Amino acid sequence: MAQVNIEKRGNVYQYRFEIAPQGGKRKFINKSGFKTKSEAQEAGNIAYTEYINAGVPFKECKLSYSDYLDYWLDNYCKSNLKYNTICKYRTIIDKYIRPRLGLYRLSTLTSVRLNMFITEICDEYSFSRSYFKNILKVVKGTFRDACNLYGFIKYNPALTLRLPKMDIEKKDPKHLYTQEEIDKILFRFRYNDTFTCSFLTSCYTGMRTGEVFALTWDDIDLDKGVISIKHSIYDKAKDIKGRWYLGSTKTLSGERLIYISQTLLSALKNYKAKQDYLKQLYGNKYIYYYLEDGKNQYGKVIEKRIVQKTEETKNQITLNLVFTKSDGKFTGTDITKYPFEIIHKELGIEKCRFYDLRGSYATKVLNSGVEIRDVADMLGHRNIETTENYYVSSTDTSRKCATDNFDKMIQSEVINEISEYLVF
């Protein structure tokens, strides 16, 4: 290193390098007693590296990138990320990153090689841009933590890594439900209380699908007309106790309080009255659930599994789930699967999803004149850019209205007269 100077003092060598000035005076670190110049140089390089790392000794990591990826999943992901995110990252690592980069040492991977990897992936696969971004996010995250969190590498080679410019085939746009489609769906399923009420809840609140089916009656104040959104559900591999879990909302801002319209409030009151009647009708055959705590397969994170009550667990606190079948059975988001097959095939409303009600709600509310900041808050977004980029779409009606409004704004006698001159 050019910063480390080696000097011979008598029969031995010393290293010397300058450090930050103190009190306006130049300061140096030196050490003598080395028999050879090369010994002094090596020791000086190590000392200088420790100095620029604020006194933390730096040891070159001999881990393969493959082993480090496992280390990162076990030590960072399991403590900081949600189960589904960990599963998604593990899939990306095992399918795309490990086979191409895993054999190299972590410390030998350079920004050039990482850029080559990203380019190869983008050329070889036709994923959506968002999925390419997820691959990039994993690569950048692993190297960021290797450098800043664990000190395995001195510099972060992924710091400036980015996706190349590329033409991504556009997917089908999100479906914006028309009022005619909503009416058609509600009429078709007018006798399916659970689906109809869950559909209305999403339609009138813009809640995420997982948030809708995580609702309990304790979250809904029918007297004040408000819903407290605190949880979301997610599923895992099914076992004897089921596969549905109650987790936190997608983001911290996802926890929110939303007001219920009179239409939805009336529907929820009627639905609850019928559910209470069915509980009495089924008696001890009605199915109830409770929450069971346990650690996930990755270690420390406590999960809350939705478990059916038995004779042994009948004294557990009941989870008053809102959207269940007539006998109380909870099937999570699966309750929408069959209805949407009917919607696609019988009603002819193709390529629509339950989740699209969220985007339809956002678009309609914004077009009604509500400020975008308020819309973002109602949807549980951290920033308005998410609302603008992913959930707010224009409609033929809104574009026609905008054109008509602009036409009225610039109307004048001169323009009208000019138009008359253009008549053939």
What is the predicted function of each stretch?
Residues 2-3, 144-156, 182, 200-233, ...:
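Short, charged phosphate-coordinating catalytic segments
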Residues 9-14, 19-107, 112, 274-318:
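N-terminal DNA-binding module of tyrosine recombinases/phage integrases
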Residues 61, 73-145, 149, 171, ...:
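N-terminal core-binding DNA-recognition domain of tyrosine site-specific recombinases/integrases
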Residues 107, 153-155, 165-187, 230, ...:
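DNA breakage-rejoining catalytic core of tyrosine-based enzymes
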Residues 148, 200, 204, 210-211, ...:
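C-terminal catalytic core of tyrosine-transesterase DNA break-rejoin enzymes
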Residues 168, 176, 233, 359-360, ...:
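Catalytic-site neighborhood detector that most strongly recognizes the C-terminal catalytic loop/helix
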Residues 224, 235-237, 243-255, 262-264, ...:
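C-terminal secondary-structure termini that scaffold catalytic or DNA-interacting sites
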Residues 226-228, 246-270, 287-305, 316-340:
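C-terminal catalytic core of Y-nucleophile DNA break-rejoin enzymes
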